[in-house]
UniProtKB/Swiss-Prot annotation:
Residues 1-48 form a propeptide. There is a cross-link at residues 49-50 (Beta-methyllanthionine (Cys-Thr)). One of its GO terms (molecular function) is signaling receptor binding. Kills a number of Gram-positive bacteria. Acts at the level of cell wall biosynthesis by interfering with bacterial peptidoglycan biosynthesis. Specifically inhibits the conversion of the lipid II intermediate into polymeric nascent glycan strands by transglycosylation. May interact with the peptidoglycan precursor rather than with the enzyme. Maturation of lantibiotics involves the enzymatic conversion of Thr, and Ser into dehydrated AA and the formation of thioether bonds with cysteine. The carboxy-terminal beta-methyllanthionine undergoes decarboxylation. This is followed by membrane translocation and cleavage of the modified precursor. InterPro entries: Lantibiotic2_lead_pep_dom (IPR027635). Residues 1-28 are annotated as: Disordered. There is a cross-link at residues 63-68 (S-(2-aminovinyl)-3-methyl-D-cysteine (Thr-Cys)). GO terms for biological process: defense response to bacterium; killing of cells of another organism. NCBIfam families: lanti_MRSA_kill, plantaricin. The keyword Nuclease does not apply. It comes from Bacillus sp. (strain HIL-Y85/54728). This is Lantibiotic mersacidin. The modification 2,3-didehydroalanine (Ser) is found at residue 64.
Length: 68
């Protein structure tokens, strides 16, 4: 696929429908919907670090002010 065709498929949804499919195939055809429902929310999120301010709020910034 040429660069122009790739860019056209990004911008134009009709062109995207007519372009070649994903080389890996359709990932949703391998799993049944019931199997995918079991995957959603399958794990608990556990924070590695919890930082709270004296007022009860938590703040972390890009400058690493809340290093654990």
């Amino acid at each position: 696929m040429s660069q122009e065709a790739i860019i056209r498929s990004w911008k134009d949804p009709f062109s995207r429908e007519n372009s070649t499919q994903n080389p890996a195939g359709n990932p949703f055809s391998e799993l049944k919907e019931a199997q995918m429902d079991k995957l959603v929310g399958a794990g608990d999120m556990e924070a590695a670090c919890t930082f709270t301010l004296p007022g009860g709020g938590g703040v972390c910034t890009l400058t690493s002010e809340c290093i654990c």
